[in-house]
Amino acid sequence: MASMQDLKRRMESITVTHKITKAMKMLSTVKLNRFKATLGKTKEFYQEFYEVIGAVITNYNKTKPRTTTPTNQSTKRLWIVINTQLGLCGSYNTNVGKLLVSELAKDDEIILVGTKLNSFLRTRNHEDQIIHTYSINDKNIDFESSYMIGKHVLELHEKNQYDSIDCVYTNYINSLNFEAKKIQLIPADPSIFQADTLDRINDKFPKNISFEPGVDVIIPALEKQLLQVILYGCLIESKVCEYASRRNAMDTAAKNADDLYNKYKLLYNQLRQAKITQEINEIVAGAAK
Protein backbone atom coordinates (compact mmCIF):
# COMPACT_ATOMS: atom_id res chain seq x y z
CA MET A 1 0.00 0.00 0.00
CA ALA A 2 1.22 3.49 -0.82
CA SER A 3 2.45 5.67 2.02
CA MET A 4 0.76 8.88 3.10
CA GLN A 5 3.54 10.87 1.47
CA ASP A 6 3.04 9.04 -1.86
CA LEU A 7 -0.72 9.60 -1.75
CA LYS A 8 -0.26 13.29 -0.97
CA ARG A 9 2.14 13.64 -3.90
CA ARG A 10 -0.35 11.90 -6.22
CA MET A 11 -3.19 14.16 -5.09
CA GLU A 12 -1.08 17.24 -5.80
CA SER A 13 -0.29 15.91 -9.27
CA ILE A 14 -3.96 15.16 -9.97
CA THR A 15 -4.93 18.68 -8.85
CA VAL A 16 -2.53 20.18 -11.40
CA THR A 17 -3.83 17.85 -14.13
CA HIS A 18 -7.42 18.74 -13.26
CA LYS A 19 -6.66 22.44 -13.69
CA ILE A 20 -5.14 21.76 -17.12
CA THR A 21 -8.05 19.63 -18.36
CA LYS A 22 -10.56 22.18 -17.05
CA ALA A 23 -8.75 24.99 -18.87
CA MET A 24 -8.61 22.94 -22.09
CA LYS A 25 -12.32 22.19 -21.79
CA MET A 26 -13.10 25.91 -21.48
CA LEU A 27 -10.88 26.75 -24.47
CA SER A 28 -12.47 23.98 -26.56
CA THR A 29 -15.93 25.27 -25.67
CA VAL A 30 -15.04 28.78 -26.85
CA LYS A 31 -13.62 27.51 -30.14
CA LEU A 32 -16.54 25.11 -30.61
CA ASN A 33 -19.00 27.98 -30.34
CA ARG A 34 -16.95 30.07 -32.76
CA PHE A 35 -16.85 27.38 -35.45
CA LYS A 36 -20.53 26.54 -34.91
CA ALA A 37 -21.33 30.20 -35.54
CA THR A 38 -19.22 30.11 -38.73
CA LEU A 39 -20.98 26.96 -39.88
CA GLY A 40 -24.37 28.53 -39.21
CA LYS A 41 -23.52 31.65 -41.23
CA THR A 42 -22.63 29.60 -44.30
CA LYS A 43 -25.76 27.40 -44.29
CA GLU A 44 -27.89 29.88 -46.23
CA PHE A 45 -25.28 30.13 -48.97
CA TYR A 46 -24.87 26.34 -49.08
CA GLN A 47 -28.60 25.82 -49.40
CA GLU A 48 -28.93 28.14 -52.40
CA PHE A 49 -25.74 26.82 -54.00
CA TYR A 50 -26.77 23.18 -53.55
CA GLU A 51 -30.16 23.89 -55.08
CA VAL A 52 -28.72 25.46 -58.23
CA ILE A 53 -25.96 22.88 -58.70
CA GLY A 54 -28.29 20.06 -57.70
CA ALA A 55 -30.85 21.10 -60.30
CA VAL A 56 -28.27 20.84 -63.06
CA ILE A 57 -26.52 17.67 -61.92
CA THR A 58 -29.65 15.69 -61.07
CA ASN A 59 -31.27 16.75 -64.35
CA TYR A 60 -28.15 15.71 -66.25
CA ASN A 61 -28.04 12.30 -64.54
CA LYS A 62 -31.66 11.63 -65.48
CA THR A 63 -31.02 12.26 -69.16
CA LYS A 64 -27.50 11.00 -69.66
CA PRO A 65 -25.24 8.48 -67.88
CA ARG A 66 -22.04 9.77 -66.32
CA THR A 67 -19.09 9.81 -68.67
CA THR A 68 -16.57 11.68 -66.54
CA THR A 69 -14.19 8.76 -66.06
CA PRO A 70 -10.69 9.81 -67.14
CA THR A 71 -9.63 8.83 -70.63
CA ASN A 72 -6.89 6.57 -69.32
CA GLN A 73 -9.56 4.43 -67.60
CA SER A 74 -7.66 4.63 -64.31
CA THR A 75 -9.25 2.99 -61.29
CA LYS A 76 -7.04 4.97 -58.91
CA ARG A 77 -8.85 7.31 -56.53
CA LEU A 78 -7.70 10.41 -54.69
CA TRP A 79 -8.72 10.77 -51.05
CA ILE A 80 -8.86 14.12 -49.26
CA VAL A 81 -8.78 13.22 -45.56
CA ILE A 82 -9.62 15.88 -42.99
CA ASN A 83 -8.08 15.11 -39.59
CA THR A 84 -6.62 17.21 -36.79
CA GLN A 85 -3.37 19.00 -36.11
CA LEU A 86 -3.45 18.19 -32.39
CA GLY A 87 -4.49 15.23 -30.27
CA LEU A 88 -6.54 14.87 -27.09
CA CYS A 89 -9.81 14.69 -29.01
CA GLY A 90 -11.01 11.19 -28.17
CA SER A 91 -11.61 8.76 -31.03
CA TYR A 92 -12.02 11.51 -33.64
CA ASN A 93 -8.94 10.69 -35.73
CA THR A 94 -9.25 6.95 -35.21
CA ASN A 95 -12.77 6.91 -36.65
CA VAL A 96 -11.64 8.91 -39.69
CA GLY A 97 -8.67 6.59 -40.19
CA LYS A 98 -10.74 3.42 -39.91
CA LEU A 99 -13.23 4.64 -42.50
CA LEU A 100 -10.41 5.58 -44.87
CA VAL A 101 -8.58 2.25 -44.51
CA SER A 102 -11.81 0.29 -45.06
CA GLU A 103 -12.29 2.02 -48.45
CA LEU A 104 -8.66 2.45 -49.50
CA ALA A 105 -7.33 0.48 -52.48
CA LYS A 106 -3.69 -0.34 -53.10
CA ASP A 107 -3.19 2.21 -55.89
CA ASP A 108 -5.20 5.04 -54.28
CA GLU A 109 -3.47 8.24 -53.18
CA ILE A 110 -4.09 10.41 -50.12
CA ILE A 111 -3.96 14.12 -49.34
CA LEU A 112 -4.07 14.75 -45.60
CA VAL A 113 -5.54 17.99 -44.28
CA GLY A 114 -4.06 17.85 -40.78
CA THR A 115 -1.03 15.87 -39.62
CA LYS A 116 -2.31 13.70 -36.77
CA LEU A 117 -3.34 10.79 -39.01
CA ASN A 118 0.21 10.26 -40.31
CA SER A 119 1.15 7.85 -37.52
CA PHE A 120 -2.14 5.92 -37.90
CA LEU A 121 -1.47 5.32 -41.61
CA ARG A 122 2.21 4.58 -41.04
CA THR A 123 1.44 1.75 -38.62
CA ARG A 124 -0.91 0.25 -41.23
CA ASN A 125 1.61 0.49 -44.08
CA HIS A 126 -0.24 3.22 -46.00
CA GLU A 127 2.38 5.94 -45.55
CA ASP A 128 3.63 5.61 -49.14
CA GLN A 129 0.17 6.49 -50.45
CA ILE A 130 0.29 9.96 -48.86
CA ILE A 131 1.24 12.41 -51.62
CA HIS A 132 0.78 15.64 -49.65
CA THR A 133 0.02 16.80 -46.11
CA TYR A 134 -1.44 20.20 -45.26
CA SER A 135 -0.68 21.59 -41.82
CA ILE A 136 -3.68 23.56 -40.64
CA ASN A 137 -4.49 25.68 -37.62
CA ASP A 138 -7.52 27.63 -36.49
CA LYS A 139 -6.27 30.88 -37.99
CA ASN A 140 -6.06 29.61 -41.57
CA ILE A 141 -9.40 27.80 -41.71
CA ASP A 142 -11.12 30.01 -44.26
CA PHE A 143 -12.43 29.77 -47.79
CA GLU A 144 -9.12 30.98 -49.23
CA SER A 145 -7.26 28.08 -47.60
CA SER A 146 -9.79 25.52 -48.77
CA TYR A 147 -9.67 27.12 -52.24
CA MET A 148 -5.90 26.56 -52.43
CA ILE A 149 -6.32 22.93 -51.38
CA GLY A 150 -9.09 22.49 -53.93
CA LYS A 151 -6.96 24.13 -56.63
CA HIS A 152 -4.15 21.67 -55.93
CA VAL A 153 -6.60 18.76 -56.10
CA LEU A 154 -8.05 19.96 -59.40
CA GLU A 155 -4.57 20.36 -60.88
CA LEU A 156 -3.89 16.73 -60.06
CA HIS A 157 -7.21 15.74 -61.56
CA GLU A 158 -6.41 17.64 -64.78
CA LYS A 159 -3.68 15.08 -65.40
CA ASN A 160 -6.41 12.41 -65.67
CA GLN A 161 -4.88 10.36 -62.89
CA TYR A 162 -8.00 9.56 -60.89
CA ASP A 163 -11.26 7.74 -61.44
CA SER A 164 -12.83 9.74 -58.61
CA ILE A 165 -12.01 12.22 -55.87
CA ASP A 166 -13.46 11.48 -52.43
CA CYS A 167 -13.36 13.37 -49.14
CA VAL A 168 -13.38 11.79 -45.68
CA TYR A 169 -14.56 14.17 -42.97
CA THR A 170 -16.54 14.13 -39.72
CA ASN A 171 -20.26 14.84 -39.83
CA TYR A 172 -21.69 16.87 -36.93
CA ILE A 173 -24.91 15.46 -35.45
CA ASN A 174 -24.90 17.14 -32.05
CA SER A 175 -22.39 18.04 -29.34
CA LEU A 176 -22.15 14.43 -28.21
CA ASN A 177 -22.55 12.55 -31.49
CA PHE A 178 -20.58 12.81 -34.72
CA GLU A 179 -19.51 10.26 -37.30
CA ALA A 180 -16.83 9.86 -39.94
CA LYS A 181 -18.30 10.01 -43.44
CA LYS A 182 -17.10 9.99 -47.02
CA ILE A 183 -18.43 12.07 -49.88
CA GLN A 184 -17.61 11.75 -53.58
CA LEU A 185 -16.65 15.13 -55.01
CA ILE A 186 -15.76 14.27 -58.60
CA PRO A 187 -17.71 12.95 -60.42
CA ALA A 188 -20.40 14.72 -58.41
CA ASP A 189 -22.66 12.21 -56.70
CA PRO A 190 -26.35 13.26 -56.76
CA SER A 191 -26.87 11.37 -53.49
CA ILE A 192 -25.17 14.26 -51.64
CA PHE A 193 -28.35 16.27 -52.16
CA GLN A 194 -30.73 15.43 -49.34
CA ALA A 195 -34.40 14.67 -49.92
CA ASP A 196 -35.58 18.11 -48.77
CA THR A 197 -33.09 19.77 -51.13
CA LEU A 198 -34.35 17.66 -54.03
CA ASP A 199 -37.94 18.63 -53.19
CA ARG A 200 -37.03 22.33 -53.34
CA ILE A 201 -35.16 21.74 -56.60
CA ASN A 202 -38.21 20.12 -58.18
CA ASP A 203 -40.41 23.02 -57.06
CA LYS A 204 -38.11 25.85 -58.14
CA PHE A 205 -36.44 24.62 -61.32
CA PRO A 206 -37.70 23.20 -64.64
CA LYS A 207 -37.48 19.46 -65.10
CA ASN A 208 -35.81 19.77 -68.50
CA ILE A 209 -32.79 22.06 -68.53
CA SER A 210 -31.05 23.08 -71.73
CA PHE A 211 -27.25 23.09 -71.50
CA GLU A 212 -25.40 25.88 -73.34
CA PRO A 213 -22.69 25.71 -74.62
CA GLY A 214 -22.99 22.01 -73.73
CA VAL A 215 -22.90 19.47 -70.92
CA ASP A 216 -19.27 18.56 -71.60
CA VAL A 217 -18.31 22.13 -70.66
CA ILE A 218 -20.88 23.00 -68.00
CA ILE A 219 -20.86 19.85 -65.86
CA PRO A 220 -17.06 19.70 -65.27
CA ALA A 221 -17.04 23.43 -64.44
CA LEU A 222 -19.89 23.03 -61.96
CA GLU A 223 -18.23 20.00 -60.40
CA LYS A 224 -15.09 22.05 -59.78
CA GLN A 225 -17.10 24.76 -58.05
CA LEU A 226 -18.99 22.15 -56.07
CA LEU A 227 -15.70 20.62 -54.92
CA GLN A 228 -14.45 23.98 -53.62
CA VAL A 229 -17.66 24.72 -51.72
CA ILE A 230 -18.13 21.24 -50.25
CA LEU A 231 -14.47 21.07 -49.21
CA TYR A 232 -14.80 24.30 -47.23
CA GLY A 233 -18.00 23.04 -45.61
CA CYS A 234 -16.30 19.75 -44.68
CA LEU A 235 -13.38 21.64 -43.12
CA ILE A 236 -15.65 23.80 -40.96
CA GLU A 237 -17.91 20.91 -39.96
CA SER A 238 -14.89 18.76 -39.09
CA LYS A 239 -13.52 21.59 -36.94
CA VAL A 240 -16.82 21.78 -35.06
CA CYS A 241 -16.62 18.02 -34.43
CA GLU A 242 -12.96 18.25 -33.41
CA TYR A 243 -13.61 20.78 -30.66
CA ALA A 244 -16.80 19.06 -29.55
CA SER A 245 -14.83 15.82 -29.24
CA ARG A 246 -11.95 17.55 -27.43
CA ARG A 247 -14.34 19.29 -25.04
CA ASN A 248 -16.01 15.96 -24.26
CA ALA A 249 -12.63 14.27 -23.78
CA MET A 250 -11.44 16.99 -21.40
CA ASP A 251 -14.74 16.90 -19.52
CA THR A 252 -14.35 13.14 -19.05
CA ALA A 253 -10.71 13.58 -18.01
CA ALA A 254 -11.68 16.24 -15.44
CA LYS A 255 -14.37 13.97 -13.99
CA ASN A 256 -11.94 11.05 -13.84
CA ALA A 257 -9.41 13.29 -12.10
CA ASP A 258 -12.05 14.21 -9.50
CA ASP A 259 -12.89 10.54 -8.93
CA LEU A 260 -9.23 9.57 -8.62
CA TYR A 261 -8.52 12.48 -6.27
CA ASN A 262 -11.44 11.47 -4.03
CA LYS A 263 -10.22 7.87 -4.04
CA TYR A 264 -6.70 8.86 -2.96
CA LYS A 265 -8.08 11.33 -0.43
CA LEU A 266 -10.14 8.56 1.16
CA LEU A 267 -7.10 6.27 1.32
CA TYR A 268 -5.02 9.12 2.73
CA ASN A 269 -7.59 9.81 5.46
CA GLN A 270 -7.83 6.11 6.28
CA LEU A 271 -4.06 5.85 6.66
CA ARG A 272 -3.99 9.05 8.69
CA GLN A 273 -6.77 7.79 10.95
CA ALA A 274 -5.04 4.43 11.35
CA LYS A 275 -1.79 6.18 12.27
CA ILE A 276 -3.55 8.38 14.83
CA THR A 277 -5.33 5.35 16.29
CA GLN A 278 -2.04 3.47 16.52
CA GLU A 279 -0.37 6.37 18.32
CA ILE A 280 -3.27 6.63 20.79
CA ASN A 281 -3.08 2.89 21.47
CA GLU A 282 0.66 3.13 22.08
CA ILE A 283 0.14 6.04 24.49
CA VAL A 284 -2.61 4.17 26.34
CA ALA A 285 -0.52 1.00 26.49
CA GLY A 286 2.49 2.94 27.77
CA ALA A 287 0.43 4.67 30.47
CA ALA A 288 -0.96 1.34 31.66
CA LYS A 289 2.48 -0.04 32.47
Swiss-Prot record:
Domain of life: Bacteria
A biological process from GO: proton motive force-driven plasma membrane ATP synthesis
Subcellular location: Cell membrane
CDD domains the record matches: F1-ATPase_gamma (cd12151)
Membrane topology: Peripheral membrane protein
Entry-linked InterPro entries: ATP_synth_F1_ATPase_gsu, ATP_synth_F1_gsu
SUPFAM superfamilies in alphabetical order: ATP synthase (F1-ATPase), gamma subunit
Coiled-coil features, chain-numbered ranges: none
Entry annotated with the keyword Glycosyltransferase: no
A GO cellular component entry from the record: plasma membrane
UniProt keyword terms in alphabetical order: ATP synthesis, Cell membrane, CF(1), Hydrogen ion transport, Ion transport, Membrane, Transport
One MF term in the entry's GO annotations: ATP binding
Subunit structure: F-type ATPases have 2 components, CF(1) - the catalytic core - and CF(0) - the membrane proton channel. CF(1) has five subunits: alpha(3), beta(3), gamma(1), delta(1), epsilon(1). CF(0) has three main subunits: a, b and c.
Function, as annotated: Produces ATP from ADP in the presence of a proton gradient across the membrane. The gamma chain is believed to be important in regulating ATPase activity and the flow of protons through the CF(0) complex.
Family: Belongs to the ATPase gamma chain family.
NCBIfam families, A to Z: ATPsyn_F1gamma
Name of the molecule in the record: ATP synthase gamma chain
